[in-house]
C-alpha cells in the first residue's frame, strides 16, 4: 500500500486560510483536518471564526467541535488523531488537507513529541494553592531557579505554562528544557507537503484582524461568551478554552475589569500578537511553498496547482 500523503496549509490568523482551503476543495476531493486548537471547542463559534455549517457541509471537516470548553486536549492527542485521520481519509480515496495556525501542534506532528509526563491533578492543585497564597510571581521565581532556560522564554504572567514547567520538574526531577533538548529523531508515518500563506503587508493583516474582530462583535460574540459563563460554571479566565484570543479579553470585560472600548482594543491587540507569534514560527519552519495572500491574486492559484501536483491529480 502506498504511503499516505497530506497537504498542509499554514498561516497566521485572518490571512485567508479557510477561503483558500475551500477553493482547493473545489478542485480536489479533499477532507480538511483542522490544525486550530480554538476550533476544538463546542459553543465557541463566533470568536474562533469557525467554518460555517454550509462550508462544513461542502467539504468534510475534522477536529472541530470535539470537546467542551471545560475539557482538555493536547499536542499528543492531535498527533494521534491527525495520523489516524490521514490514513482514514486516504483509504476513502480522498486527499487529506491540514489547515490552521496552531504551530505547537504542527511542531509536534513534524518533529515528534517529548517524553513528558501526563498532568498530575494533585500536584496541579498544590501549585494552584501556592499561586493563590503567594502569587504567580512566586511560581515564576521558583521556575527561574530550577529551570532558568524555560523561565527565560516564558512571560512572567503565563500562568498555564509556568505551572506546567514546574509540574514537569517536580514529577521527573529534570527541567522541561532538558526534556525538550533531548528530543529523539522523529519520522512521519505519511508524506507531508507544507505550504504557507505569509503576508508581507503587515498593515493589511492588521486591518483584516480589526475588521474581523468588529464583525464578530456584530455577530454576537459577547453573547456567546455570556452563554459559556452560564453553561459552564467551572470556567475561569485561566481555563485553556478562555485563553483563546478574544475570549480572555471578553471574559475580563464581563467581569467589569474593562469598558467596552478597552475590551475591543485589547482583543484586537491580542489577535495581532497571536499573528506575530505565528509568523515567527513560520519563518523558522521548513516550507515547500510560500505565497503572499495579499500580493497579486495569483498566490491561491499557485498553491492549488502545488496541491494538485503533490496528490498527482
Curated annotation (Swiss-Prot):
Record carries keyword Transferase: yes
Keywords per UniProt: ATP-binding, Magnesium, Nucleotide-binding, Transferase, tRNA processing
Enzyme class: transferase
Region (Interaction with substrate tRNA): 36-39, 160-164, 243-248
Catalytic reaction list: adenosine(37) in tRNA + dimethylallyl diphosphate = N(6)-dimethylallyladenosine(37) in tRNA + diphosphate
Top-rank taxon: Bacteria
Cofactors named for this entry: Mg(2+)
Xref: InterPro entries: Dimethylallyltransferase, IPT, P-loop_NTPase
GO molecular function, one term: ATP binding
Binding site for ATP: 11-18
EC code(s) of this entry: 2.5.1.75
Chain's role: Catalyzes the transfer of a dimethylallyl group onto the adenine at position 37 in tRNAs that read codons beginning with uridine, leading to the formation of N6-(dimethylallyl)adenosine (i(6)A).
HAMAP family in alphabetical order: IPP_trans
Name of this protein: tRNA dimethylallyltransferase
Organism: Neisseria gonorrhoeae (strain ATCC 700825 / FA 1090)
Amino acid at each position: 500500500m502506498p504511503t499516505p500523503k497530506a497537504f498542509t496549509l499554514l498561516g497566521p490568523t485572518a490571512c485567508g486560510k479557510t477561503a483558500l482551503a475551500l477553493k482547493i476543495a473545489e478542485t480536489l476531493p479533499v477532507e480538511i483536518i483542522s490544525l486550530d486548537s480554538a476550533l476544538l471547542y463546542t459553543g465557541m463559534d463566533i470568536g474562533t471564526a469557525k467554518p460555517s455549517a454550509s462550508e462544513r457541509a461542502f467539504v468534510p471537516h475534522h477536529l472541530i467541535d470535539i470537546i467542551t470548553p471545560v475539557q482538555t486536549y493536547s499536542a499528543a492527542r492531535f498527533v494521534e488523531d491527525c495520523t489516524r485521520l490521514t490514513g482514514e481519509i486516504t483509504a476513502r480515496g480522498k486527499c487529506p488537507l491540514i489547515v490552521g495556525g496552531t504551530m505547537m501542534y504542527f511542531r509536534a506532528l513534524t518533529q515528534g513529541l517529548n517524553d513528558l509526563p501526563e498532568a498530575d491533578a494533585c500536584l496541579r492543585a498544590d501549585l494552584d494553592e501556592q499561586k493563590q497564597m503567594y502569587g504567580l510571581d512566586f511560581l515564576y521565581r521558583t521556575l527561574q531557579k530550577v529551570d532558568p532556560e524555560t523561565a527565560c522564554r516564558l512571560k512572567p504572567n503565563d500562568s498555564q505554562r509556568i505551572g506546567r514547567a514546574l509540574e514537569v520538574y517536580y514529577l521527573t526531577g529534570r527541567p522541561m528544557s532538558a526534556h525538550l533538548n533531548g528530543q529523539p529523531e522523529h519520522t512521519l508515518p505519511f508524506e507531508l507537503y507544507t505550504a504557507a500563506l505569509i503576508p508581507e503587508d503587515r498593515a493589511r493583516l492588521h486591518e483584516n484582524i480589526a475588521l474581523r474582530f468588529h464583525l464578530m462583535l456584530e455577530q454576537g460574540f459577547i453573547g456567546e461568551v455570556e452563554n459559556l459563563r452560564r453553561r459552564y460554571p467551572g470556567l475561569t479566565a485561566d481555563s485553556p478554552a478562555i485563553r483563546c484570543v478574544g475570549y480572555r479579553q471578553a471574559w475580563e470585560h464581563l467581569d467589569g475589569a474593562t469598558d467596552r472600548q478597552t475590551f475591543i482594543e485589547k482583543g484586537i491587540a491580542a489577535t495581532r500578537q497571536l499573528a506575530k507569534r505565528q509568523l515567527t514560527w513560520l519563518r523558522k519552519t521548513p516550507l515547500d511553498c510560500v505565497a503572499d495572500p495579499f500580493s497579486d491574486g495569483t498566490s491561491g492559484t499557485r498553491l492549488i496547482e502545488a496541491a494538485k501536483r503533490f496528490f498527482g491529480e
